[in-house]
Structure formats: structure tokens, C-alpha cells
Amino acid sequence: MKVIGISGQTGAGKTTFAKELEKTLSGLFSVIYIDVDSLGHEVLKDPITIEALTKTFGKDILTDNQIDRKKLGAKAFESSQNTELLNSIMHPRMVKIVENIISENSKRPKNKIIIIDAALLYKMNLVRLCDKVIYIKADPEIRVRRLMATRGWTEERARQRLFSQDKEPEGFKIIIPGKDSFSNFRRFLSFFKKDYNLLVFENNGTKEDFESIFQPMYFASIFLRYKI
């Protein structure tokens, strides 16, 4: 069994990459995809979590006695202090769920890949559970335009969220810059076969550039199959 963590900057294409990776690897492995953001949505429904959040941020974050994510976000991201308060309540609960999923699947590990899709992979210390990490980045102005186009955010909101997530991590890196399939195949092969634990993908290009990355990744990942 291998655990691959996917992290990245807001608007860089992290979740799109993670879902495409899931499809790419599913022909070779039994793939379990963990969307940590979605786990957070589930945790928000827990009565103990609701009580902790309302004590911290006030009852005006509720709508019909449930957490209103938009109202909570407005308060939680208005200052770094509030963001840390939110994280201190949410993260331990979310991490525990991820740990339980990995523990359960480790009982039958043959030909199994677990993908952890988490914007705060490092800050939540989920990276300690990962064998490999792929980090998706893009230039700030490109990310702002994407967030405004795909999520309908204002420019102010997009820029506010740009800097609320993990910074680019340090470690062994293989930079995947673009569309050269053979070059990318060699990079992915090095990532899967050798002791590199971090791959950084710069997603500054077009949708076609982005999609071109997965065919060489598929062929390179064949080598991973014989190691798990």
C-alpha cells in the first residue's frame, strides 16, 4: 500500500489534479480517494463541533441550527487569529478520520493506493502519513483569475484566500513544467522509482497542457505497481 498526498495553492488545480490522478491509477490499483475538505463539511454537522464553533465565533454563524459555511468563512478568514481558531477546532477531528481510513485499509494493503487531497496537508501534519507528495502550484495572478471564473469569487475574496493555505514545501523536487510527454515520463519515473518524496507541478498552462500530464504518469506508475 502507498499513500500519496496531493496539496497545493488555492486556484492552482489541486483537486482537479487529484481526481485525474485517481482515474489514472484506478486501472492499475485499488484506489481510495480521501477529500479532506469534504470531511470538513461532514465534521461541521457534528453537534460537538457545532457547539465548539458557536462558542468561539458566535451563534450568528448558524442557519436553522446548522453551521452556515459562508457565515463561518466570513468570520474565520477575516484574520489569521480567527483562521487558527477554526483550524484548532476542525483539524484534529478531520485528521482522526483520515487516520482511521488508512488504518482500516492497511489490513488488506495489496495493490492499494490511498490519495489524500488536502490543501493543508502540511499544516495538518497529514504529510507524516504519506509515502509521496505531489504539490500543485501556479502564478498568483493566474490563480486569482481562475478563482473568479470558476467559483464566482470577487477579486478581493480571491486574493484573501490566496495566502491562507500552506506555503510551498521544502524537499526533493521534480518540477513538471509543461507538455513534453517523454520528459514528463522520465520525471514521473524518477519520482516513483527513486527516493524523491516530493513532486512539484507548475500548472500555469492551458487545460490541454494540464491533461497531457496524465498519460506519461500512467506509464510511469506501472513501475510503482511492482513495489506495493
Q: For each predicted feature, which ranges?
A:
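P-loop (Walker A) phosphate-binding loop of NTP-binding proteins
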Residues: 9
